[in-house]
Amino acid sequence: MPTQPVVRIGARGSKLSLTQSGIVQRRIAAALGVDPDNAAEVERVAPLIPITTTGDRVQDRRLLEIGGKGLFTKEIEEALMDGRIDCAVHSMKDMPAELPEGLCIAAIPEREDPRDAFISRGPERLEDLTEGAILGTASLRRQAQCLHRRPDLEAKLLRGNVETRLGKLEAGEYDAILLAYSGLRRLGLGHLPKSLIDPKEAPPAPGQGALAVETRAADRDLPWAQALRCRPTTLAVAAERGALIALEGSCRTPIGAHAWLEGGTCKLIVEALSPDGKLRFRHSGEAELSQMADPEASARDLGLSLGLAVKEEAGDAIVL
């Protein structure tokens, strides 16, 4: 009998990352012909390899102060390039606009709800917070979007895993916090938010709610990778990341992008703000993809076009 392939999966060591990686792990095992409910067999053919990243170790500063989004992926990508793992599972919103040479995003599974979640010790909505209330977030985008709507609020740094952030809210260090709803749902905490932020009013981070399965470029089209792909999610994320690339997005730039499909049409909203929320630059548009030879490239082109329009209008106003 031929030897069954083994796919080693690299992931950050946090509870959320391991939960998200576990979702992909079971999908890979199924693609390899293993019962996804047989935990021992799943671990045998698709073992999880936890890797601690610099972004996990440094918790007292914003990402932009210590190197940006790549700090959540660098060590994992090194393991991928060295051959210690065969794929890596990331939150798509943590992926930099440009990937290291020789690596690629081989699959994007079905997306979770991309909205931001508002969690507080009382008020139901951002608008209901008292004047001067303390809002916790480590995201420059969330900070800018909230200050645009509520300039009287005090935005305060909030780093750490989901459990740590919720604990700080409960301890009274913050009046409210904002988290990605997708992560809460995957952790079984989807009941905690008081409300959800309308993504057309305040677009989330490009790719929020989606997972990226990264491989070596030579492994892009292996059968197990193809089995993970979700076409609607791939097209929407292509549009959002097109905007990210056009805006040269990083943790120093408050950028939101929200794409969705209506039939064969991809619709996209892109916005960028000044870090203090006083200035907001927004463009929206759509592209018909159903007749295109390469729908993913066409979706990306839509994002590039709208992102460039925002960039030309905003200039240096959106960079911290």
From Swiss-Prot:
Cite the entry's keywords alphabetically.
Answer: Porphyrin biosynthesis, Transferase
What InterPro entries does the database record attribute to this sequence?
HemC, Porphobilin_deaminase_cofac_BS, Porphobilin_deaminase_N, Porphobilinogen_deaminase_C, Porphobilinogen_deaminase_C_sf
Swiss-Prot/TrEMBL catalytic activity: 4 porphobilinogen + H2O = hydroxymethylbilane + 4 NH4(+)
Gene Ontology biological process: protoporphyrinogen IX biosynthetic process
Q: Which residues carry this modification: S-(dipyrrolylmethanemethyl)cysteine?
A: C251
Record GO terms (molecular function): hydroxymethylbilane synthase activity
Asked if the Swiss-Prot or TrEMBL record annotates the protein with the keyword Iron, the reply is: no
Q: Name one Pfam family in it.
A: Porphobil_deam
EC number(s) on file: 2.5.1.61
* Coiled coil stretches, renumbered: none
Cofactor(s) annotated in UniProt: dipyrromethane
Q: Which biological pathway?
A: Porphyrin-containing compound metabolism; protoporphyrin-IX biosynthesis; coproporphyrinogen-III from 5-aminolevulinate: step 2/4
Manner of cofactor binding, per the entry note: Binds 1 dipyrromethane group covalently.
Query: Listed GO cellular component terms?
Result: cytoplasm
Which top-level group of life is the source organism from? Bacteria
- Identify which top EC class this enzyme belongs to: transferase
Q: Which family does it belong to?
A: Belongs to the HMBS family.
SUBUNIT field: Monomer.
Give the function comment from the record.
Tetrapolymerization of the monopyrrole PBG into the hydroxymethylbilane pre-uroporphyrinogen in several discrete steps.
The extra comment attached to this record reads: The porphobilinogen subunits are added to the dipyrromethane group.
Descriptive protein name: Porphobilinogen deaminase
